[in-house]
UniProtKB/Swiss-Prot annotation:
This is Malonyl-[acyl-carrier protein] O-methyltransferase. Pathway: Cofactor biosynthesis; biotin biosynthesis. Keywords: Biotin biosynthesis, Methyltransferase, S-adenosyl-L-methionine, Transferase. One of its GO terms (biological process) is methylation. It is an enzyme of class 2 (transferase). The gene is bioC. CDD domains: AdoMet_MTases. Gene3D superfamilies: Vaccinia Virus protein VP39. Converts the free carboxyl group of a malonyl-thioester to its methyl ester by transfer of a methyl group from S-adenosyl-L-methionine (SAM). It allows to synthesize pimeloyl-ACP via the fatty acid synthetic pathway. It comes from Laribacter hongkongensis (strain HLHK9). GO terms for molecular function: carboxyl-O-methyltransferase activity; malonyl-CoA methyltransferase activity; S-adenosylmethionine-dependent methyltransferase activity. Belongs to the methyltransferase superfamily. Pfam families: Methyltransf_11.
Amino acid sequence: MTEAFYTDKSRVRASFDRAAATYDRAAVLQREVCDRMATRLDLIRHAPARVLDAGSGTGYGAGLLRARYPEAQVTELDLAPSMLRASRDKQLPQGRLRRLFARAPALVCADLEQLPLASGSLDMVWSSLALQWLNTPDAVLAEFHRVLRVDGLLMFATLGPDTLKELRQAFAGIDGATHVNQFIDMHDMGDALVRAGFATPVMDVERIVLTYDEVKAVMRDLKAIGAHNATAGRGRGLMGRQAWQRIEAAYDRLRQDGRLPATYEVVYGHAWRPAARPRRKLDDGRDIIEFHPHAPA
C-alpha cells in the first residue's frame, strides 16, 4: 500500500462519531452483510461462551449474535464512542428507574489493533465491515489470534478492491488526491490469515450493487454511515464546481437502466485458532522441520 492510501485512524474515529445519529437509517449494506454472515453460521458447528463483535458500530451484528447464542456473553468493541452509546441506548429500557436496574451491555471503546482483552479469553471473534479501515490486516489478525482460545472461531466480512469502482472511476484524473480508500484482495487476506497462525481458512466473495438516482445520493449515504475518505493522500480543500460537474458527468456515463450503480465487493472469511505445535530444536538452536513425502502410486 502506498503512503497516499494510508488510513488516518483519528479521522476514521471522528467520522463515525459524527455519523452515529444517522448511521442506522443509511446502513442498508451493513445490515445485509451481517445477515449474510449470520446465515453462514448455520453451516458451522460452534457453541461459544464468550464472543467479541469487533467493530460493532451501533450494535446490529451484536443483536444477531445474542439471538443466536442466548447463553453467550457478547462484547461490543468499536473505535467510535458515539457508536457504542447509540447501541447502548437501543438496548437499555426506557425510563430512568428501569434503566437504573437494567443490566448494562458489555461495551468497549478501543482500537482493533490493540485489544484490551486477555489472551485466550474468547471463543469467537466476529467482525463485519471493519477490517477495511485498517492499513494492513496483519496487526489486527495477530490480535484476534491472541485473544482467541484454542479452537476459537474468527468470522469476518470486509471489502475487496472492486468496492466503489464506479466512484473511483468518476474521480480518476480530477486531481492528484486520493478519493476512495484502497481495499485488500481476497487472496491477500487469506495469506494474512495463515501468517497470523490461523488454520483452515475459508474465503469467498460476492458483489452487492446498490443503485441511486444521482451521484449526490451516493455521497450522502457514505457520509451518513461515516464512510469518509480517510486516506493520507486525500484532498484538504473544498472541490470546485467545475471539478464536481466533471465527476457527475463521468459517473452518469455509467448509468444502467436509469440508475447509477455503486458496487461493493464483499469478502467473507472464517478460520480457526489451532493448538500450538511443539517446536523441536537441535542443540545448536536450529528448528527441526519434519517432511513426510508421499509414497509413489
